[in-house]
Design a protein with these regions (language model features):
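Glycine-rich phosphate-binding loop of nucleotide-binding enzymes
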Residues: 92
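Short, flexible, mixed-charge glycine/proline-rich loop motifs
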Residues: 628-644, 684-691
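Short linear recognition/processing motifs and adjacent strand/loop elements at protein termini
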Residues: 637, 679-688, 724-729
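Short, structured motif recognition centered on aromatic/hydrophobic residues
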Residues: 642-659, 692-696, 704
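Short recognition patches in nucleic-acid-associated and regulatory proteins
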Residues: 650-690, 709-711, 716-717
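Short, compact, well-ordered microdomains
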Residues: 688-725
Length: 730
């Protein structure tokens, strides 16, 4: 809503910053008290403050998708508390159930506590982190082998286990008996209590300064301001319907690899956004998602495209947004007994990619250059990882879960720069990669290398971010074992505006290696020296055993590119070759740039190579010059509904038709194209196959759009710009 009354602008901003500072200090308390590297270094946690509605007053933004779990979990507790007569300061609920309380997955445990002022209940505080273990057949909250939710570990619908600021002793015993690392898990819960205590203390100080009535007034003002600015941005997006499709890979059980389709239709109507998700029926595997992950990941996409960085995160941002996930019983709206222990990282992260996909389609057609400048290639939003359990070198046990390869994923290319290397996931805006020394000090592992993977970023005028290759051996133990999981091996993240998709992720063990032989010679087992027997494994493993000196290699995927690779500055390509970001063959075959042995651009050979690639694209000599486009990819004349090439203005479709129908199409299995391009993807041999559909302007041969789809899918729709169907019917 728009603010119509006068208010003290400076006081409102001071108050807004105070709310943000409280959530930041909650985060500092978590980091200082947890001791878990997942918290202290990876920063896999979030904190927030809410009013009694509940609505966000501040959010620490370390992991963005917790905007969903914090809101839904607190809503459930607030409903229970509304009929309770014994709500007291120091009470606290523990929550980790995706089905009943909006948790992202069981490994993400929340502690939610009421806040008070002079005896009056005035709101809620929330702290969440990924704890080391929650029991069940999986380790650290991941259970690829589970067939139902009860196999996955402990479930806490909102349970009030905290009284007077301490965990009930009987509940302590219960939790300790059901997890593999009771000490660290219980300490993490205590650290979340401490974080909430910080919220209560700091909030009291702020209200003492402002007064309770002014506190509430400024909370409303700042929510109204966030809503107002977001609505102003949405109004600059063309009304219409924007659609996208993606696939979740493989269920983790025996049988053929599955591709599970999910879709999103976004309706832009004035200053409102309506999300309509749909998906295939739920399955008996840990990939299913529920309301918390779906809402959180939809908002994560929106926050990174339209909000995060320059708009305060509070309840006002959710007012223009409606998220629908369709009828119960699908992979986007699963119900018990569906397993959900990777809801956030499987279907959930696909939901985030879909959110960004439709928003980038919409922003690309805006008349506002600032909004057009916010489009970007897809981030990887999937990572190859594992979780292990076994004895360590200190005479105890270790639960190993390294989010390194999640934070090591490449970021999508942007209009102003290449994608960030080792960017992380869309949601991990505050994430970090733990030091190797900390891993080796706590766990029985020896790291062999961490390096960036050449050619891993999606090609484009702006290149996608490069990804991390990491390898470690179980060196100080006879054996460790646990699940393995990789959400993005066959369907990599696509680019935007003619940019190309990026590397997908992959992992594999290497057995019978020469680690000890090298160490005995006084040599480090580096990437160049290490040898062993690579074992090809599937993307989801209920159990993988790593014996002594078995190496686990995990290669993250990169970020999608932006714009035609043939428009990339040849000097930038030469620098990438010099820095070993790009191989010479990749520079030549994809970018059309010939780089000499001393890393200089051979201009004549480059011009000839680029002309050769253009002619190959359309099967003949282009009739128009390829030049930097006014608009990335395709342009739309709104009055006539005419689609045209953003570079040479060649007409592609009229009257609201599909621009893809007027483009020159080249389609091939993605594994074949990646082999030609020197890039990485897992070949899918089952039907349907994953293909790359490249669309080129028939006149200038510019790359207009590159789709990554299954070979049985119809041509993707172009946006339908105009009044959304729902609005027209009302």
């Amino acid at each position: 809503m728009s603010i119509t009354h006068d208010y003290d602008v400076i006081a409102a901003e001071v108050h807004r910053k105070a709310m943000q500072n409280i959530t930041d200090e909650m985060a500092i308390t978590l980091v200082r008290t947890s001791g878990s590297p997942i918290v202290t270094e990876s920063k896999d946690f979030s904190t927030c403050l809410m009013n009694t509605v509940p609505e966000h007053l501040g959010f620490s933004s370390y992991v963005l998708f917790h905007v969903g779990s914090s809101l839904i979990g607190t809503q459930v507790i607030a409903k229970e508390a509304s009929v309770a007569t014994d709500l007291q300061p120091g009470d606290g609920w523990i929550v980790n159930d995706p089905h009943s309380a909006g948790a992202m997955h069981q490994g993400d445990v929340s502690v939610i506590m009421p806040t008070f002022y002079e005896g009056e209940h005035i709101g809620w505080s929330f702290a969440n982190m990924h704890v080391l273990d929650v029991g069940g057949v999986g380790i650290s909250g991941y259970a690829p082998g589970a067939h139902d939710v009860w196999q996955e570990g402990m479930l806490f619908p909102p349970v009030r286990i905290i009284r007077e600021g301490a965990i009930d002793s009987e509940w302590e015993k219960y939790i300790a008996a059901n997890v593999r690392a009771p000490g660290p898990v219980l300490n993490d819960i205590r650290s979340m209590i401490a974080s909430n205590n910080t919220a209560q203390k700091k909030l009291t100080n702020v209200i003492n300064e402002f007064g309770l009535d002014s506190h509430r007034e400024y909370c409303e003002i700042n929510m109204d301001l966030s809503e107002q600015v977001l609505r102003e941005r949405i109004e600059k997006i063309p009304d219409g319907t924007y659609e996208a499709v993606d696939w979740n890979e493989f269920d983790g059980h025996e049988g053929p690899d599955q591709l599970l389709e999910l879709r999103l239709k976004l309706e832009v109507d004035g200053s409102d956004l309506r999300y309509h998700y749909s998906g295939v029926p739920q399955i008996d595997a840990f990939v299913n998602s529920t309301m918390g992950p779906m809402f959180g990941q939809a908002m994560t996409g929106l926050m990174t495209v339209l909000i995060n960085g320059d708009l305060p995160v509070n309840g006002g941002l959710w007012r223009p947004i409606d998220v629908e996930i369709g009828p119960p019983g699908t992979i986007v709206n699963a119900v018990p007994p569906a397993p959900v222990s990777n809801a956030h990282s499987e279907v959930g992260m696909r939901a985030c990619k879909l959110s960004k996909d439709v928003l980038c389609q919409a922003l690309a057609l805006s008349d506002d250059p600032v909004l057009r400048g916010r489009i970007a290639g897809q981030h990887q939003d999937g990572f190859p990882g594992n979780a292990l359990f076994g004895n360590n070198q200190h005479g105890g046990v270790s639960v190993v879960f390294y989010p390194d390869n999640a934070i090591g994923a490449g970021g999508g290319a942007q209009t102003i720069m290449d994608g960030l290397d080792a960017y992380g996931l869309t949601c991990t805006t505050g994430g970090g990669i733990p030091d190797i020394e900390n891993h080796e000090g706590a766990d029985p592992v020896l790291f062999l290398w961490r390096r960036l993977i050449p050619n891993s970023g999606g090609p484009g005028q702006m290149r996608g971010g490069q990804a991390l290759d990491q390898a470690y051996a179980v060196h100080y133990s006879d054996m460790m074992a646990g699940p393995g999981f990789n959400a993005c091996a066959q369907v990599p993240p696509h680019g935007v505006g003619g940019g190309y998709p990026a590397n997908a992720g992959i992992f594999y063990p290497v057995r019978n290696g020469n680690i000890q032989e090298l160490l005995d010679k006084g040599l480090l087992p580096t990437y160049e020296r290490f040898e062993g027997e690579k074992e090809d494994v599937r993307s989801k493993l209920g159990h993988i055993k790593l014996d002594h000196d078995t190496v686990f290699v995990a290669l993250s995927g990169g970020g999608g590119g932006l714009g035609d690779p043939l428009l990339r500055d040849p000097e930038a390509v030469a620098r990438d070759v010099a820095f070993e970001y790009t191989t010479p063959d990749h520079a030549s075959s994809v970018y059309g740039v010939i780089v000499t042995d001393d890393h200089e651009v051979d201009e004549a050979a480059t011009t000839a190579k680029r002309e050769e690639i253009r002619a190959t694209r359309i099967g003949g000599t282009p009739s128009a010059e390829l030049k930097a486009p006014v608009n990335i990819g395709v342009s739309l004349t709104h009055d006539s509904g005419t689609w045209s090439c953003g570079s040479c203005s060649e007409e592609l479709a009229t009257g609201g038709g599909n621009w893809r129908d007027g483009a020159k199409l080249s389609e091939a299995p993605i594994a074949e194209r990646y082999a030609e391009m020197g890039m990485q993807v897992r070949d899918r041999v089952e039907a349907p196959r994953v293909v790359m559909r490249e669309h080129f302007c028939p006149s200038c041969a510019m790359s207009l759009g590159v789709d990554v789809v299954t070979d049985d899918l119809e041509t993707l729709k172009a946006p339908e710009v105009g009044t959304p169907v729902a609005a027209a019917a009302s």
